[in-house]
């Protein structure tokens, strides 16, 4: 990781403006977004803070355009032009930041990049309040993109892709998964594990829950985590114990 020198900052500004303007068509925009993402990932915290501050402070709505559109809207409230003026005001308030953020979603790992970028914002925002505008805008977009209607609920088993299983071990936030045998125990026939996934992040569980099937409530969670305990006959279960739920994405 490295910082951001003056020459690099000039080039990044150029790429950001080109991305925001959309010149050159979709393919060119995707290539520029890819270069920006690669540059960002190579930066240290100081460099990332500078990168994000440029987006936050230089790509907001144009105050003069907003003021004019608002005045036109006020003048048109009682006329047949009201809806046209309202649309113009809405467009004037739409920042270039939104166009920039949308460019990243076209990348293979673009949605995950934006989720991680917001995690950086949450870390850095205390040191630089100017980042709040970008954080709020990105939060709004992510909330829309990650609406539960767009998510896929999947059961995770021992036969799920290895990358998904590795993510369970990495992200378990309640009861640490200590080994592969520990994980296998939690995915045995008397257990269930379900996770929400986003179509653009198929190997990244967003939130997952671990369930034990039993015939009674457990006295303590350690009995559920005991790898050497006998496997319960799942068809006889009349109790489902939700013993762990993990939210995996900081952003």
Regions found by a protein language model. Give the residues of each.
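Extended, composition-driven regions rather than compact fold-specific motifs
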Residues: 1-251
């Amino acid at each position: 990781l490295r910082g951001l020198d003056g020459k690099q900052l000039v080039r990044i500004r150029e790429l950001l403006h080109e991305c925001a303007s959309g010149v050159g068509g979709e393919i060119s925009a995707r290539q520029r977004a890819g270069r920006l993402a690669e540059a960002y990932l190579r930066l240290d915290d100081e460099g990332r803070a500078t990168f994000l501050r440029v987006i936050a402070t230089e790509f907001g709505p144009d105050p003069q355009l907003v003021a004019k559109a608002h005045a036109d809207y006020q003048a048109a409230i009682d006329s047949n032009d009201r809806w046209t003026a309202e649309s113009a005001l809405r467009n004037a308030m739409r920042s270039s930041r939104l166009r920039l953020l949308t460019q990243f979603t076209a990348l293979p790992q673009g949605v995950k990049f934006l989720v991680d970028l917001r995690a950086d914002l949450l870390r850095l925002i205390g040191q630089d309040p100017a980042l709040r505008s970008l954080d709020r805008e990105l939060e709004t977009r992510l909330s829309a993109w990650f609406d539960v209607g767009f998510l896929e609920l999947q059961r995770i088993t021992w036969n799920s892709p290895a990358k998904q299983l590795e993510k369970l071990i990495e992200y378990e936030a309640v009861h640490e998964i200590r080994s592969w045998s520990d994980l296998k125990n939690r995915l045995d026939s008397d257990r269930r594990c379900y996770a929400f996934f986003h179509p653009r992040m198929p190997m990244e569980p967003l939130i997952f829950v671990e369930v034990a099937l039993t015939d009674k409530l457990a006295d303590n969670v350690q009995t559920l985590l005991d790898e050497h305990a006998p496997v319960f006959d799942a068809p006889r279960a009349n109790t489902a114990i939700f013993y762990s739920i993990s939210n995996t994405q900081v952003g």
